[in-house]
Amino acid sequence: MLNSWPLAKDLQVLVEIVHSGSFSAAAATLGQTPAFVTKRIQILENTLATTLLNRSARGVALTESGQRCYEHALEILTQYQRLVDDVTQIKTRPEGMIRIGCSFGFGRSHIAPAITELMRNYPELQVHFELFDRQIDLVQDNIDLDIRINDEIPDYYIAHLLTKNKRILCAAPEYLQKYPQPQSLQELSRHDCLVTKERDMTHGIWELGNGQEKKSVKVSGHLSSNSGEIVLQWALEGKGIMLRSEWDVLPFLESGKLVQVLPEYAQSANIWAVYREPLYRSMKLRVCVEFLAAWCQQRLGKPDEGYQVM
């Protein structure tokens, strides 16, 4: 049992150091001196009885304990800000511009309707919604919040899981009547595969797991596109086998217009909100992330706890 609890201001100092990359830059952000920042980190490390940061000529790096502390600090500070927002006598409302990015298919089918509902709840917000067919850089593309269907998030961003998702192999019954259904990943090379080049997907390489191992298989076919919506239409027309997100194909699987191929295999493709600044700093960012998380989980359902994609 600790003799005292870490102070919120010390957790904030740690977060600022991680995001700015140095003690001096964190001090400037906080409006304090480097000596103040150093002292608060020393107090935090003494309180927790562990080393949180390693300093060298190349910069500052989190220790294993520091990484865990940083992750908890983000959550604690966000909860603390939520407490202040909820109980303060002067109710504040999120306002101003927020720029949101997403891929075309998921953006049109899910995020655009979500933004419509978001604006009903928070009319003081201004939203610029931009769709991309490539992986974006939040700074260069001037995006505050990016919705990504991809588990590989760079360390210099913060990511909040909106909901679980996986990509699965599907084909129309018409196609599977013409060609024997593959019994292994290797047999995919003998099939017409509908290849998609969207944002995070490597063209012609499908990485699939069965809960025990992950394999990469090279695929090809007569048709390919950078539009998942076009590839889905081709699959429905019986043109080949595709790899698509579960949220995109579930209605067609239920209606029998598509059949799952090699159902023991899938590709992890969870849906994330990706941003640069901690949520406790920005009410409008926090409101958007929390709203989109609730929206996605309500409409896409809870994840299948019994399935694990390697």
From Swiss-Prot:
Membrane is among the record's keywords: no
Disulfide bonds: none
Pfam families, A to Z: HTH_1, LysR_substrate
Cited PANTHER family: HTH-TYPE TRANSCRIPTIONAL ACTIVATOR TTDR-RELATED (PTHR30537:SF5), HTH-TYPE TRANSCRIPTIONAL REGULATOR (PTHR30537)
Record function comment: Positive regulator required for L-tartrate-dependent anaerobic growth on glycerol. Induces expression of the ttdA-ttdB-ygjE operon.
Similarity remark: Belongs to the LysR transcriptional regulatory family.
Protein name per Swiss-Prot or TrEMBL: HTH-type transcriptional activator TtdR
Source species of the chain: Escherichia coli (strain K12)
